[in-house]
Regions:
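Cap/insert and terminal regions of metallo-dependent hydrolase folds
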Residues: 157-251
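Short, basic, glycine/proline-bearing loop/turn elements
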Residues: 148-155, 189
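Binuclear metal-dependent hydrolase catalytic cores
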Residues: 1-149, 159, 169, 229-259
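Active-site flanking residues adjacent to catalytic metal/cofactor-binding acidic residues
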Residues: 22, 48, 150-152, 180-182, ...
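Histidine- and/or cysteine-centered catalytic micro-motif in compact active-site loops
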Residues: 130-131, 142-144, 153-155, 182-184, ...
Length: 259
C-alpha cells in the first residue's frame, strides 16, 4: 500500500521544540519507532476527538514504556461532564486492555480543551470546535511565521452544499498547509451525509476560499485502493491549480517542510 493503512497521527517537528503530535491513532505506534531510544520522550498531542481511530495508538506508543517519559494530551471537553482523562482511561484498562493508562511507566497528562488559544513551548495553538459526531476540535498551529491547520474529521453540510462555520474558517484562513478530511466522493456522501465527514470537493473548495497555500487530502476512506486515490488526487490537483492551491494526498511517512 503506497498510501499506508494506519489511522490518524501527524507529528510536527521544529528546531528547539519538543515533539507536537496531532491525534493518537494507530499511526502513533509507527511514529514511536522513529523516536530516538536513547532519549526520553517528552512531547504533547492535540487530540481532535475520542473516536477509536484517533486514540487506539496510545497504549502501543513504545516511548511511554520508559519511566521519565511524558505526553501531555489536549482534547475536547465532553458534554456529559466526564473529563478527557476519564473517557480515555475507561477504554484502556482490563478487560479491554491488559494494563491501564496509569500503569504505563511514562506519564500521560490530559487537559480538557474547548474554543481557546494557548501555547506549547513556542508553538501558538488555536483550538476551535468544528462540526462532527460528538465534541470535536480542529487546530491551527503557528511557529516562527509558519502555519498549519488540522481538521481531520469535518462534517460538510448534510445537504451537500458548501459553507463553513466561523470557527472552522478561523483555523484555516491563509495557512501554509491545511490537512483536511477528504473521505468521500459526492455519490458516497449522498449515502453517508450524516456520518461526520466531507467530500474531496469540499476540502478543495475550503482551501480555495481560505486562500490556503497547500492542501493535504487526509482521512482517506479505508476502502480506497491506491489507484483510486491516485485518480481522485489528479482531479483535486487540477481543481486546486485553477485557484492557486497546491493539492497533495497525505500518505504514511510523508514529510512536508514549511518554508
Amino acid at each position: 500500500m503506497r498510501y499506508g493503512g494506519n489511522t490518524s497521527c501527524v507529528s510536527i517537528d521544529a528546531p528547539g521544540e519538543r515533539p507536537l503530535l496531532l491525534d493518537m491513532g494507530t499511526g502513533l505506534r509507527y511514529y514511536g519507532k522513529r523516536v530516538d531510544p536513547d532519549h526520553l520522550f517528552q512531547g504533547s498531542c492535540l487530540l481532535t476527538h475520542l473516536h477509536w481511530d484517533h486514540v487506539q495508538g496510545l497504549p502501543f506508543f513504545a516511548p511511554l514504556l520508559r519511566e521519565g517519559s511524558s505526553l501531555d494530551v489536549y482534547g475536547p471537553a465532553q458534554t456529559d461532564g466526564r473529563t478527557l482523562d476519564e473517557v480515555v482511561s475507561s477504554t484502556i484498562r482490563p478487560p479491554l486492555f491488559p494494563v491501564s493508562v496509569d500503569e504505563l511507566p511514562g506519564d500521560v497528562r490530559f487537559h480538557d480543551t474547548a474554543d481557546t488559544d494557548f501555547e506549547i513551548g513556542a508553538f501558538k495553538v488555536k483550538a476551535r470546535l468544528i462540526p462532527h459526531l460528538g465534541p470535536t476540535l480542529g487546530f491551527r498551529v503557528e511557529w516562527n511565521g509558519r502555519s498549519l491547520a488540522y481538521l481531520s474529521d469535518h462534517q460538510q453540510p448534510c445537504d451537500g452544499s458548501f459553507s463553513v462555520t466561523p470557527g472552522a474558517f478561523d483555523l484555516v484562513d491563509g495557512v501554509d498547509l491545511l490537512i483536511h478530511d477528504a473521505q468521500y466522493t459526492p455519490p458516497e456522501f449522498a449515502v453517508k451525509a450524516t456520518w461526520g465527514h466531507c467530500t474531496i470537493d469540499y476540502a478543495v473548495w475550503l482551501a480555495e476560499k481560505a486562500k490556503v497555500k497547500q492542501l493535504a487530502l487526509y482521512h482517506h476512506d479505508p476502502s480506497r485502493r491506491d489507484d483510486d486515490l491516485d485518480a481522485l488526487l489528479s482531479c483535486a490537483v487540477e481543481s486546486g491549480a485553477q485557484h492557486g492551491v497546491d493539492v497533495i494526498a497525505a500518505s504514511e511517512g510523508l514529510v512536508v517542510e514549511l518554508a
